[in-house]
A protein has these predicted regions:
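Acidic/polar-rich alpha-helix caps and helix-coil junctions
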Residues: 3, 11-196
Length: 196
């Protein structure tokens, strides 16, 4: 298990096959219209109460993940694997937990040379940092996020915010020009860098 998990979530209580209460971390995927019959883990309220006061605008681990991505893409001549591992370790230090021995020997956490792996760990590192996870997903398409009938936009992820109503009213002429240029003012309209 990732040692950051108890910081991010609390264990849920469910019944096992014998009717006994069992506490464990239970994730619920997004995109489902019907509520599951299991009780999922909730965010850790203690962390939620203190995280906004103690999180920097850009953490050291985020800088290292950016550098790991640049190295993975061949933009800088550095070791992407070393940067990835340093980024994960820096994030664990940020949360006050130790990197478990053998953490990078696990196939689910070992650097495999892909942007996807970097972005999965960056997603965890950006927990409690406003909308940054969403921006990173929109920019890269990672991590894989399931969609389905429970997502308000159906099978499409939201890519952008709609123009505010006040702007639509107060600057109508330019708003209409912008909408015409983009194709629509819908939250599923892809942004220019997503259309390439």
């Amino acid at each position: 298990n990732d040692p950051r998990l108890p910081i991010f979530a609390v264990k849920a209580t469910n019944k096992d096959e014998n009717g006994k209460d069992v506490k464990d971390y239970v994730g619920l995927q997004s995109g489902y219209a019907d509520m599951p019959t299991i009780n999922g883990s909730a965010p850790n309220a203690t962390t939620l109460a203190t995280a906004p006061q103690s999180i920097a605008l850009m953490t050291y681990s985020e800088v290292l993940f950016i550098k790991a991505e640049l190295a993975q893409r061949g933009i800088i001549q550095q070791d992407a694997a070393a940067l990835y591992e340093a980024a994960v370790e820096a994030n664990m230090q940020q949360w006050g937990v130790e990197l478990p021995a053998g953490y990078f020997e696990n196939p689910k956490t070992a650097y495999d040379g892909t942007l996807k792996r970097i972005m999965e760990q960056k997603f965890y590192a950006l927990f409690f940092i406003d909308f940054q996870q969403w921006f990173e997903y929109n920019r890269t398409g990672y991590p894989d996020v399931p969609t389905g009938p429970g997502v308000a936009t159906g099978d499409a992820m939201p890519y952008r915010y709609k123009y505010p109503a006040i702007l639509q009213r107060m600057n109508r002429e330019n708003y209409l020009k912008a909408v015409e240029s983009m194709g629509s003012d819908d939250i599923t309209t892809k942004l220019i860098w997503q259309k390439r």
